[in-house]
Every structure is written in C-alpha cells, then in structure tokens.
Amino acid sequence: MPTKSLERLILEFNKLPGVGQKSATRYAFHILNQSEEDVKNFAEALLAVKENVKKCHVCGNYCESDTCNICSDNARDHRIICVVEESKDIMILEKTTKFRGVYHVLNGRLDPLNGITPNELNIKSLLERIAKDDIEEIILATNPNIEGETTAMYLAKLMKNFGIKITKLASGIPMGGNLEFSDTATISRALDDRIEI
C-alpha cells in the first residue's frame, strides 16, 4: 500500500492526458528514485511554466511576452494565416519548416455534443484580424476528424464574404487522425497540396 504522499503523486500524474494508473505509478516511483536536486528542478520547471507562459495577444499561441516570436517576426508572411486547433499544432507544423506565414489558435474545435460552440473558441479575434489586416489567405489546419472538419466548414462559411483565399490541408493525414501523430513529411505534403474551399 503506497504512502499518502505517494498516492497523491500517483493521482496527480493520473490526471495527465494519456496517463493511466500504471504509467502514473511508474512516474511516481521514478520521481522517488531521482535526486533531490532533480526533483526540485522538475518542480521549479512546472511552476515556471505556469507563472511565465501566457497567450499571445495576436494569435493565441503560448509565449512568455505579450506577442509570440512568430507574430513578432517581420520575416514571416503576415498575409497568410494558418488556423490551428491548439498551440501544440503550431509546434508540429513548424517542424516541417515549410510554412512561413503566421498562425491563429482556436483553443479547440466545435463539438456541440460536449458543449463546445463557436462562443467557446477564439474565432472573434480571427475575424477581427482578417477585417483589419491585409490578409490574402487563410489555411484551415484543423484535424481531419468530424469535429475538425465541422470547424473548418463553419469558419470557411464565416469568412466567405471577406474575399480572401481559403484553403485547407490536403489529404495525406488520415480521416479521424490527428496532426500531433503525423510525420513531418506528410504534413509538409498536406501544406504544399492544400486545396481551396
């Protein structure tokens, strides 16, 4: 029977996505076997990320200043916005080194069955960016599942009257798949072969 402190640590690890009881227990015992300095560094890293990381006021990506390094980079093409569901999708797309535009993070996808409606997503600021900036193209890089496709179609409909090019990633990422689990070559091809909607 684990101690109360160990039980609490297992419970906290178990709250992480994709971490079951066995993995949580393994992580907790790993922490127990680490040096005090390693555990302290781990705890400090957790606290630092919570204290220092915030959302970019332009795109919604995570950063440690008011504007993320992508939005503040003048070498990027600010006329092309790639719309993603989550900040982690930006990291995946950036690994391809193919996309040189900027991003917009929705903070989720439409999922009415779970109470996620357009009001819960970061859509209003996207429309404001399109209205005030010189935007030429929106790339909808939502995940190829029912919720992602529904979100892409909803956004395409909303943006139709702006008179800009609206594209989405080409196939190659399997239906029901996730950008997170696709390799960089597949994502690069999907960006290169994007289709207008």
UniProtKB/Swiss-Prot annotation:
Top-level taxon of the source organism: Bacteria
Keyword DNA repair: yes
Residue ranges constituting the Toprim domain according to the UniProt record: 79-174
Intrachain disulfide bonds: none
MF-aspect GO terms: DNA binding; zinc ion binding
CDD domains on file: TOPRIM_recR
Pfam family of the protein (one): RecR_HhH
Keywords assigned: DNA damage, DNA recombination, DNA repair, Metal-binding, Zinc, Zinc-finger
Biological process per Gene Ontology, one example term: double-strand break repair
Zinc finger (C4-type): 56-71
Cross-referenced InterPro entries: DNA_Rcmb_RecR (IPR000093), Rcmb_RecR (IPR023627), Rcmb_RecR_Znf (IPR015967), TOPRIM_dom (IPR006171), TOPRIM_RecR (IPR034137)
HAMAP family: RecR
Function as written in the Swiss-Prot or TrEMBL entry: May play a role in DNA repair. It seems to be involved in an RecBC-independent recombinational process of DNA repair. It may act with RecF and RecO.
Similarity remark: Belongs to the RecR family.
Protein name, per record: Recombination protein RecR
Organism: Fusobacterium nucleatum subsp. nucleatum (strain ATCC 25586 / DSM 15643 / BCRC 10681 / CIP 101130 / JCM 8532 / KCTC 2640 / LMG 13131 / VPI 4355)
